[in-house]
C-alpha cells in the first residue's frame, strides 16, 4: 500500500532539489518578485531539468500501472464526491476539479498569460465528475506538463530577469553604496513599499 506513496515522494524530492538549485529553497521558494524573478537560471540547471523530464514519464507510468489496477484505491475514488457540471460552475471550481466534471476550461487557453499563447498543449477532461475522474485528469496533466516544459525551455528568452523601474524594483546592492539616487530608491521602497496608482487589478492564473 505504501509503494506508490514512496515512489512519488522520491520524484517529489528530485523536483525539490531542482527548486533548491534555482532559488536556494526547496519548499518556500519565493522565486518570483515584483518586476521579475530573483535570479537567472544557469545552463547546468537547465540541463538537469531536461534530464529529469526525460526520465519522468517512465517513473509516472510505473506508478500509474501499480495504482490504476488497485481495487481498493479505485473503490475509494470511483463514484465518490460526484460533482455535476452545474455544481462545478456554481461552486467556482477551477483546475482539475472543474475539468474532472467535463468542462474544458483552462486559463492558459481562455486567458493566456506569460507566453502560454505560444505553447501547444491539450486540455485534459473527464466526464464522470467523481474523485476518480479528477485523479485521472491530474494524471494526464502530468504527462501533458512534460510537453509544456519542453516547449518552455526551448522558448526561454535570454536577457534581464528583472525590470528596471525604480518605483517598483529594488536597486542592485552594489549600486546602493555608490549612487545617491539608488540609495534613495532603496530607502523609499523598503520603508514605504510600492505606491501604485489608485485603482484595482486582478490577474488569475491556472490552478
Segments (PLM) and residue ranges:
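Metal/cofactor-centered catalytic core regions of large enzymes
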Residues: 1-207
Amino acid at each position: 500500500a505504501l509503494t506508490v506513496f514512496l515512489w512519488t515522494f522520491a520524484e517529489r524530492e528530485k523536483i525539490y532539489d531542482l527548486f533548491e538549485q534555482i532559488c536556494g529553497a526547496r519548499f518556500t521558494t519565493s522565486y518570483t518578485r515584483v518586476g521579475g524573478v530573483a535570479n537567472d537560471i544557469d545552463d547546468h540547471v537547465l540541463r538537469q531539468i531536461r534530464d529529469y523530464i526525460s526520465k519522468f514519464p517512465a517513473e509516472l507510468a510505473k506508478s500509474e500501472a501499480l495504482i490504476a489496477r488497485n481495487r481498493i484505491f479505485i473503490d475509494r475514488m470511483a463514484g465518490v464526491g460526484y460533482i455535476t457540471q452545474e455544481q462545478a460552475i456554481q461552486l467556482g471550481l477551477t483546475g482539475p476539479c472543474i475539468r474532472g466534471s467535463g468542462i474544458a476550461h483552462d486559463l492558459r487557453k481562455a486567458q493566456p498569460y506569460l507566453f502560454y499563447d505560444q505553447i501547444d498543449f491539450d486540455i485534459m477532461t473527464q466526464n464522470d465528475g467523481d474523485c476518480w475522474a479528477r485523479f485521472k485528469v491530474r494524471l494526464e496533466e502530468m504527462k501533458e506538463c512534460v510537453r509544456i516544459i519542453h516547449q518552455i525551455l526551448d522558448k526561454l528568452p535570454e536577457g534581464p530577469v528583472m525590470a528596471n523601474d525604480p518605483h517598483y524594483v529594488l536597486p542592485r546592492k552594489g549600486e546602493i553604496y555608490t549612487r545617491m539616487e539608488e540609495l534613495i530608491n532603496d530607502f523609499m521602497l523598503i520603508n514605504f513599499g510600492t505606491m501604485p496608482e489608485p485603482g484595482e487589478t486582478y490577474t488569475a492564473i491556472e490552478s
